[in-house]
């Protein structure tokens, strides 16, 4: 009997000695992949979410973040998360317009005035329609960039100036560029600095925080203020990883969905203002404002984009006109 007690105690002792600290503490470790560099807004929001989750779960959850495509790239993100290569991932739906048809309606020229409004409108759109494209993932946040403007090496003051110019743009932004007569070149944002350096593109259409975050102001000394399409983003989680979480942890993450989406939009709007001021001061970037007549002329060219989206989405069995109306209603609600 005594030998059995000693043996049992020995086994328990060894189990304690060789158990990992995480296992002993019951820590839940999750990986979070992101594609752009660490200083950019998708990664800033990632780090903020990590801090909030770890704090609100009392250290029960530990998030390991992987910025800069170190775990998954932009175009591999959603499939990689579904396959379990990362527990959580963040990417832009603009890179796959045919896959995320409903949520990419937010990238149409629908008049989103700022990132906060766009982020909340996008989240409303997702919650209303629950697109099939997200059925195998848990959505943890959605947000948009601020409206896009043209950053270029050469001044673009009229539609004549933009004709045939190679400009980076993905998803809705690519359609906008084509409608204006530019030559849209699709590529992930992290590939754009090198493309600018090598002359593959002469500029891009995107939100202006990139002037500072990607140092585009070093090469693009002109910005044409078009204030048009946005880029929609989603933060998603592997469904098995989600289902394995305790209910109290799930509640923390669910409670953060709206808060995180709005926080990111507000951060983006503030950061854009800082980036504009920095670009002017550091590189004397010229910001070209279109007058009312010019702006109306540029915007008029974009009408067929929404018409084509309605046609294509309807052909796929989606209530396209209703979806577009829902986007506009959500924008008006959150302005």
Per-region residue spans from a language model:
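Absolute protein N-terminus
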Residues: 1, 25-26
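Bacterial N-terminal signal peptides that target proteins for export
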Residues: 1-10
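C-terminal segment of classical bacterial N-terminal signal peptides
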Residues: 15-23
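N-terminal secretory/targeting leader peptides
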Residues: 26-117, 125, 129-335
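P-loop NTP-binding core
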Residues: 122
């Amino acid at each position: 009997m005594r030998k059995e007690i000693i043996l049992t105690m020995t086994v328990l002792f060894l189990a304690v000695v060789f158990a990992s600290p995480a296992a002993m503490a019951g820590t839940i470790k999750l990986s979070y992949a992101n594609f752009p560099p660490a200083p950019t807004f998708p990664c800033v929001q990632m780090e903020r979410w990590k801090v909030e989750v770890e704090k609100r779960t009392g250290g029960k959850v530990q998030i390991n973040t992987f910025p800069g495509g170190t775990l998954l790239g932009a175009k591999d993100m959603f499939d990689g998360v579904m396959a379990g290569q990362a527990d959580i991932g963040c990417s832009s739906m603009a890179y796959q317009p045919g896959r995320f048809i409903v949520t990419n309606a937010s990238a149409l020229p629908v008049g989103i005035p700022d990132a906060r409004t766009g982020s909340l409108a996008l989240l409303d759109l997702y919650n209303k329609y629950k697109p099939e494209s997200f059925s195998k993932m848990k959505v943890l946040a959605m947000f948009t960039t601020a409206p896009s403007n043209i950053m270029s090496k050469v001044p673009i003051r009229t539609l004549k100036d933009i004709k045939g110019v190679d400009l980076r743009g993905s998803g809705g932004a690519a359609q906008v560029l084509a409608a204006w007569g530019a030559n849209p070149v699709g590529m992930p944002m992290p590939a754009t600095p090198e493309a600018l350096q090598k002359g593959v593109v002469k500029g891009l259409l995107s939100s202006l925080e990139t002037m500072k975050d990607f140092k585009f102001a070093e090469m693009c000394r002109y910005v044409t203020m078009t204030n048009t399409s946005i880029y929609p983003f989603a933060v998603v989680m592997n469904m098995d990883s989600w289902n394995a979480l305790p209910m109290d942890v799930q509640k923390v993450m669910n409670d953060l969905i709206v808060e995180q989406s709005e926080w990111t939009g507000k951060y983006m709007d503030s950061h854009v203002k800082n980036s504009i001021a920095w670009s002017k001061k550091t590189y004397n970037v010229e910001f070209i404002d279109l007058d009312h007549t010019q702006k109306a002329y540029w915007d008029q060219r974009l009408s067929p984009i929404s018409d084509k989206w309605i046609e294509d989405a309807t052909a796929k069995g989606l209530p396209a006109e209703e979806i577009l109306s829902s986007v506009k209603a959500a924008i008006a609600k959150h302005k």
